[in-house]
Amino acid sequence: MWESKFSKEGLTFDDVLLVPAKSEVLPRDVDLSVELTKTLKLNIPVISAGMDTVTESAMAIAMARQGGLGIIHKNMSIEQQAEQVDKVKRSERGVITNPFFLTPDHQVFDAEHLMGKYRISGVPIVNNEEDQKLVGIITNRDLRFISDYSMKISDVMTKEELVTASVGTTLDEAEKILQKHKIEKLPLVDDQNKLKGLITIKDIEKVIEFPNSSKDIHGRLIVGAAVGVTGDTMTRVKKLVEANVDVIVIDTAHGHSQGVLNTVTKIRETYPELNIIAGNVATAEATRALIEAGADVVKVGIGPGSICTTRVVAGVGVPQITAIYDCATEARKHGKTIIADGGIKFSGDITKALAAGGHAVMLGSLLAGTSESPGETEIYQGRRFKVYRGMGSVAAMEKGSKDRYFQEENKKFVPEGIEGRTPYKGPVEETVYQLVGGLRSGMGYCGSKDLRALREEAQFIRMTGAGLRESHPHDVQITKESPNYTIS
C-alpha cells in the first residue's frame, strides 16, 4: 500500500484525443440508442443532471422528447418531487389508461383547477367514482364564457352525442375519428360504457413531432428522480414509485460509503424490479461495491463538474477519463453499465466519455442555460444568463442537498461547490441537436456504427499541452460565435 501511493496517473478529457479510423458509416446513419438496463433504453445517450438549477419536469419532458432522460432533483418535498414525476408521465401518452375524471356534482372550479394544474384542455365526466360510467366531457370551450365557477359541472358539460371508441383502438384509428368529428379528445369505453382510457389529438401530434422520444411500454415519457440517504429516503422512493418513476438515482458525493451501500441494498430488496442508478464513484472497487449492493447502473465522477470544488476543498478525486475507464472495466465484468457524470465542456468530450467506457453522459452546465432549466434568468452587462449552482454550494445545501455531502447534522456548511451564471441558450432542443451532432461526427471519424462499436473499438492518443492548444482555434480572433463552441 505504501509503495503504491503514486503508482497511477490520471487523464481527463483535455489529455486525450480519439484516433481516426477507416470508416464505412456516415454520421447521419450511426445508431445512438443504448440500453442502460433491460428495461431502460435511451435513444440518445444524454441525461440531464438531478440538480436544482438543471432538471425539473420541463427539462425532463424536453430531454425525453429528444430521446434522452431527465433526473428530477430532490431539493423539494417528497410530494413536490412525486408531482414533478407525475407531470412528466402524464405529459404525453399514446393512450392514457388512467385519465383524470370528475363527476357532474363537482363544481366548474374543480375542472378549471385540474385543467390549469396539468395544462390539459378537457376532462371526462363520469356518473360517480365507483361506476365510472361516462356521461359527458368538459373542455376549455365549455368554460370560456362562464363567470360563476361555483356552478355544477352538470350544467355546462357536453353530454349529447358524445363521440367514444372502444378499448384497443389504435392511434391511427383514433386520429381518423378525431378528424372526422373535429374533436380533440376521444374517450375509450368498454361495453358497459365505463371510462377506460383517453386519446387526445395533442398526444398524436407529439408522436409525429417527436418520433425519437424515450418512452416506457405504455407510451409515456420516461423520467428519473434523485434520492439521498436520509431517514425519509424509503418514503420518498415509495411515493416516486407510485408516481411511476422509471429509475431512481441514489445521488451522493461519495457513493463508496456504507450508508449509500446500505440504502442501495434496502431499495433493491424492497423493489426488486426497480431500475437503480447509484453514485458518485471514481474507482473500480467502488463500482464493484455498488453493483454487489444492487445497483443496475453506476454514476462516475468525483469533482469534475464546472461548479464542483471537491477536488480543491477536499483534495480528492480521479481525473474523469481515467475514472470512466477504470469503472467501466469493472462494470463490464458484471454485465452492468456506467454513466459519465461531469467535466464535459464540448460535444467532443461526450464522444471521448463514451469511447472510454461510458454508456451515457450526464450533463449539468451544458443544459443549465436553456429555457427549460429551473434556474433564474438574470441580465448581466446587457446579456441574458441563467443561475447555475453546484449541489454542494451553500445555497443548494441550505435548500436540502446537505445530505449529499454528509453534512445534514451541521449548523455550518463546508461547501464543495459554487454558485455562478451561464449564458442563456434558448430551447434545450437546439443544444441537444448540436451535442448529438458532434457525437455523430466523432463516431463517423472513428468508423463506429453504434455506441457499442465506439466503446469496444475506438483508440485514444495522449497529447501534450501544445496538442491541446493546437486543437482549439488559434492565431485568429473569433468574430462570430459558433453554436457549439464557446470559451467562457
UniProtKB/Swiss-Prot annotation:
GO terms for biological process: GMP biosynthetic process; GTP biosynthetic process. The keyword RNA-binding does not apply. CDD domains: CBS_pair_IMPDH, IMPDH. Residues 95-153, 157-214 form the CBS domain. Mycophenolic acid (MPA) is a non-competitive inhibitor that prevents formation of the closed enzyme conformation by binding to the same site as the amobile flap. In contrast, mizoribine monophosphate (MZP) is a competitive inhibitor that induces the closed conformation. MPA is a potent inhibitor of mammalian IMPDHs but a poor inhibitor of the bacterial enzymes. MZP is a more potent inhibitor of bacterial IMPDH. Keywords: CBS domain, GMP biosynthesis, Metal-binding, NAD, Oxidoreductase, Potassium, Purine biosynthesis, Repeat. SMART domains: CBS, IMPDH. It holds the Pfam family IMPDH. K(+) binds at G303, G305, C308, E470, S471, H472. It catalyses: IMP + NAD(+) + H2O = XMP + NADH + H(+). NAD(+) binds at D251, G301, I302, G303. The keyword Ribonucleoprotein does not apply. Its cofactor is K(+). Pathway: Purine metabolism; XMP biosynthesis via de novo pathway; XMP from IMP: step 1/1. Catalyzes the conversion of inosine 5'-phosphate (IMP) to xanthosine 5'-phosphate (XMP), the first committed and rate-limiting step in the de novo synthesis of guanine nucleotides, and therefore plays an important role in the regulation of cell growth. HAMAP family: IMPDH. Belongs to the IMPDH/GMPR family. This is Inosine-5'-monophosphate dehydrogenase.
